[in-house]
């Protein structure tokens, strides 16, 4: 017997609308560690949808560091950084990150979402407007909404569009962009945006969640790739759950900005610090990223990207202009993207379909992500499978058009 529900009609209607549009999201449970050869519902797959770009999430050195730090400092942070939750592993990680990136200070946050909410809501308000890229991550948009600041979004990657929006404001504000865009994989024109912010005396903030660890000299991300520093890029946000293979986030900035954020960034002030064990594991990850092994992993990832693009450019799809680990194939229709994703699963490839509202309407896609942990054979399997599925779909479409 079906139990009576007190769920509001508008909730049920919203869910039904998502179902009708093939946009329902669901959780998938892995039965294995975060590795390329994964197991889902007792089925074996080669996964191409993780953000573990360097393959460090299951690295034995990180596991050992996490265990050792937990033995010494426990598992829980216990409190916010400002009460009694800032332990020695947190301090060591902050100092190491600051030294690596060339900033005066680093502040740890529990998630990248919280870092962006904290920084933006503290620095912008009704009198300090925000101008940001139209394809920025949701957390950057939500930070602006939380700040209740005037928000204008410029055309993707278009510095001239950003210039026009900044010129409309008499007051100084905050210019924000992703470093690497999470759904397209392209890199923002950071040098030009930095110059624009400096020209108009605006603050400049970059979220380099998908660049740090993978790009630039010593893995220092878009900062190094674009030749920027702590002066030309005064507020840098990085996440630790991607190339670092752990969890959490940080803000790299000046002493003055860090002191200000310590007072006014509410998601920093009013939340428990990340686990000290995670901080210890992340420090081990940073050491790996800076080592010869880290460079070898970046080189292997770059080879995978080159091979993938060479193979896929011969298929009946348009490649996006990305030279990063994120290699999307835009399908367009949500239902078609789901069908292709399901067909790939039958060939042992796990690659999720990304649909609106995560991406703009009409641009549903396969968000393929590559990792240094993938083998050459994994890449061959992926490209062979894509060729089989996409070619068959094109032939079927031609048959339907002939009828």
Swiss-Prot record:
<comment type="function">
    <text>Catalyzes the decarboxylative condensation of pimeloyl-[acyl-carrier protein] and L-alanine to produce 8-amino-7-oxononanoate (AON), [acyl-carrier protein], and carbon dioxide.</text>
</comment>
<feature type="binding site">
    <location>
        <position position="210"/>
    </location>
    <ligand>
        <name>pyridoxal 5'-phosphate</name>
    </ligand>
</feature>
<feature type="binding site">
    <location>
        <position position="25"/>
    </location>
    <ligand>
        <name>substrate</name>
    </ligand>
</feature>
<dbReference type="Pfam" id="PF00155">
    <property type="entry name" value="Aminotran_1_2"/>
</dbReference>
<comment type="pathway">
    <text>Cofactor biosynthesis; biotin biosynthesis.</text>
</comment>
<dbReference type="GO" id="GO:0030170">
    <property type="term" value="F:pyridoxal phosphate binding"/>
</dbReference>
<dbReference type="InterPro" id="IPR015421">
    <property type="entry name" value="PyrdxlP-dep_Trfase_major"/>
</dbReference>
<feature type="binding site">
    <location>
        <position position="137"/>
    </location>
    <ligand>
        <name>substrate</name>
    </ligand>
</feature>
<comment type="similarity">
    <text>Belongs to the class-II pyridoxal-phosphate-dependent aminotransferase family. BioF subfamily.</text>
</comment>
<dbReference type="InterPro" id="IPR015424">
    <property type="entry name" value="PyrdxlP-dep_Trfase"/>
</dbReference>
<dbReference type="InterPro" id="IPR050087">
    <property type="entry name" value="AON_synthase_class-II"/>
</dbReference>
<dbReference type="GO" id="GO:0009102">
    <property type="term" value="P:biotin biosynthetic process"/>
</dbReference>
<feature type="binding site">
    <location>
        <position position="182"/>
    </location>
    <ligand>
        <name>pyridoxal 5'-phosphate</name>
    </ligand>
</feature>
<dbReference type="InterPro" id="IPR004839">
    <property type="entry name" value="Aminotransferase_I/II_large"/>
</dbReference>
<keyword id="KW-0093">Biotin biosynthesis</keyword>
<comment type="subunit">
    <text>Homodimer.</text>
</comment>
<feature type="binding site">
    <location>
        <position position="358"/>
    </location>
    <ligand>
        <name>substrate</name>
    </ligand>
</feature>
<keyword id="KW-0808">Transferase</keyword>
<dbReference type="InterPro" id="IPR022834">
    <property type="entry name" value="AONS_Proteobacteria"/>
</dbReference>
<feature type="modified residue" description="N6-(pyridoxal phosphate)lysine">
    <location>
        <position position="242"/>
    </location>
</feature>
<dbReference type="InterPro" id="IPR004723">
    <property type="entry name" value="AONS_Archaea/Proteobacteria"/>
</dbReference>
<feature type="binding site">
    <location>
        <begin position="112"/>
        <end position="113"/>
    </location>
    <ligand>
        <name>pyridoxal 5'-phosphate</name>
    </ligand>
</feature>
<dbReference type="InterPro" id="IPR015422">
    <property type="entry name" value="PyrdxlP-dep_Trfase_small"/>
</dbReference>
<keyword id="KW-0663">Pyridoxal phosphate</keyword>
<protein>
    <recommendedName>
        <fullName>8-amino-7-oxononanoate synthase</fullName>
        <ecNumber>2.3.1.47</ecNumber>
    </recommendedName>
</protein>
<dbReference type="GO" id="GO:0008710">
    <property type="term" value="F:8-amino-7-oxononanoate synthase activity"/>
</dbReference>
<feature type="binding site">
    <location>
        <position position="239"/>
    </location>
    <ligand>
        <name>pyridoxal 5'-phosphate</name>
    </ligand>
</feature>
<dbReference type="InterPro" id="IPR001917">
    <property type="entry name" value="Aminotrans_II_pyridoxalP_BS"/>
</dbReference>
């Amino acid at each position: 017997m079906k139990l009576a529900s007190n769920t509001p009609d508008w909730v049920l209607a919203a869910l039904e609308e998502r179902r009708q549009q093939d946009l329902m999201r669901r959780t998938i449970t892995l039965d294995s560690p975060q590795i390329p050869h994964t197991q889902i519902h007792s089925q074996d797959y080669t996964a191409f949808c993780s953000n573990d770009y360097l393959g460090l999430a299951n690295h034995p050195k990180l596991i050992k560091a996490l265990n050792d730090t937990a033995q010494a400092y426990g598992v829980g942070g216990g409190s916010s950084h400002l009460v009694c939750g800032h332990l020695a592993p947190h301090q060591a990680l902050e100092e190491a990150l600051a030294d690596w990136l060339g900033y005066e200070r680093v502040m740890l946050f529990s998630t990248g979402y919280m870092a962006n909410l904290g920084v933006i809501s503290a620095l912008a308000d009704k009198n300090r407007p925000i101008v940001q890229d139209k394809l920025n991550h949701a957390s950057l948009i939500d930070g602006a909404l939380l700040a209740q600041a005037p928000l204008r979004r410029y055309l993707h990657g278009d510095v001239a569009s950003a210039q026009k929006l900044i010129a409309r404001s008499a007051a100084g504000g905050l210019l924000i962009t992703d470093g690497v865009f999470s759904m397209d994989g392209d890199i923002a024109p950071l040098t030009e945006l930095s110059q624009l912010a400096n020209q108009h005396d605006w603050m400049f903030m970059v979220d380099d969640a998908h660049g740090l660890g993978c790009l630039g000299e010593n893995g220092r991300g878009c900062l190094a790739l674009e030749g920027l520093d702590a002066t030309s890029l005064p507020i840098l946000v990085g996440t630790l759950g991607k190339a670092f293979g752990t969890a959490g986030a940080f803000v790299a900035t000046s002493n003055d900005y860090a002191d200000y954020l310590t007072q006014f960034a509410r998601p920093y002030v009013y939340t428990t610090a990340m686990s000290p064990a995670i901080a210890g594991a992340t420090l081990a990850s940073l050491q790996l990223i800076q080592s010869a092994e880290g460079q070898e992993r970046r080189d292997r990832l770059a080879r995978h990207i080159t091979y993938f693009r060479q193979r896929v450019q011969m298929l009946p799809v348009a490649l996006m202009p990305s030279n990063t680990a994120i290699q999307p194939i835009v399908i367009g229709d949500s239902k078609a993207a789901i069908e292709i994703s399901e067909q790939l699963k039958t060939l042992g490839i796990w690659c999720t379909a990304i649909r609106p509202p995560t991406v703009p309407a009409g641009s549903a896609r396969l968000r393929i992500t590559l990792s240094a942990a993938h083998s050459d054979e994994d890449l061959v399997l992926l490209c062979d499978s894509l060729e089989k599925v996409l070619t068959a779909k094109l032939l079927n479409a031609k048959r339907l058009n002939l009828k």
